[in-house]
């Protein structure tokens, strides 16, 4: 009789169960360490299918997020699949399998691109696309394919309109995507005439941050700019339900639910009418201990500090350019540069650079998946 080995629960509530993969995955060849590297799983290049560097960079970042990869490698996604929209999620699972358990230095994302292109034809064209927009489409489609319905119960003991508003469930649909990436902003809106305050919730998977300087600033500067109080006047006035007319208002945002993995979009592309330009500001961002305490509502400060786990870089201008990715591997704990099929290990000091476009931060360090011996 064989004994069942218990698996440790990780900080995300998802088991690291690479050792318990299905028989199909067991038949796939696994990359062997060459002696100089502890392991090369998850360090695989992606072929460029014609201006698809934006897609490759995003896929490498998602491939570096262990709890997401484990969810697909374990086969858990199969039981959650919605039959009418399973093609993208299934193609994503096969691609993650090739990138983690295959024996090739690089693989082709053609099947995944084709599946997503059936829904969004723009991604099948050999033209450059925006990596942030592509990321949002991918996360949305994975959520739609894997969502389950949840019916929340009322909390009768809560007092205060702000607290009640913050504690409402974000959505009745949950998935591995919402569990990992979805956060919630809470806006306090004060009418400057009657001084009454109302609250509004807004979910997010990516936070788009303004860049307050043209030359140099920090990620904290971008966060402070995003979360500072804003006064809406003239054409931007908001309807006040108490005054029953549009009024000048003061609006301030806070994070009422911090996601386990928070993604920042640095708004480098400035488009005003027919004028387009790229902000080449050198933005300094920490690799560890990003403190979000000032921006999280006090009663929801469960994950105040974050560590960087992946970066999407953009070179060039708005009408062209090239995307690459920096990702931290959960096996080796080393950083790697992914430039389509070209993969190389880089020192921590190289992760900070002036071309960063998307930043992926995790509230907990990723655990090393259990390997089958």
Curated annotation (Swiss-Prot):
PROSITE patterns: USP_1 (PS00972), USP_2 (PS00973), USP_3 (PS50235). One of its GO terms (molecular function) is cysteine-type deubiquitinase activity. Gene3D superfamilies: Cysteine proteinases. Its main location: cytoplasm. Residues 44-364 form the USP domain. The active site is at 53 (nucleophile), 322 (proton acceptor). GO terms for biological process: protein deubiquitination; proteolysis; regulation of cell cycle G2/M phase transition. The keyword Protease applies. Keywords: Cell cycle, Cytoplasm, Cytoskeleton, Hydrolase, Nucleus, Protease, Thiol protease, Ubl conjugation pathway. It is an enzyme of class 3 (hydrolase). InterPro entries: Papain-like_cys_pep_sf, Peptidase_C19_UCH, Ub_carboxyl-term_hydrolase, USP_CS, USP_dom. GO terms for cellular component: centrosome; cytoplasm; nucleus. It catalyses: Thiol-dependent hydrolysis of ester, thioester, amide, peptide and isopeptide bonds formed by the C-terminal Gly of ubiquitin (a 76-residue protein attached to proteins as an intracellular targeting signal). Its EC number is 3.4.19.12. It is found in: Cytoplasm; Cytoplasm, Cytoskeleton, Microtubule organizing center, Centrosome; Nucleus. The human ortholog is inactive. Deubiquitinating enzyme that removes conjugated ubiquitin from specific proteins to regulate different cellular processes. Regulates the inflammasome signaling pathway by deubiquitinating 'Lys-63'-linked polyubiquitination of the PYCARD/ASC adapter protein. Regulates the ubiquitination and stability of the ACE2 protein. Acts as a negative regulator of the G2/M checkpoint pathway, by preventing serine/threonine kinase WEE1 degradation, thereby repressing entry into mitosis following activation of the G2/M DNA damage checkpoint. Belongs to the peptidase C19 family. This is Ubiquitin carboxyl-terminal hydrolase 50.
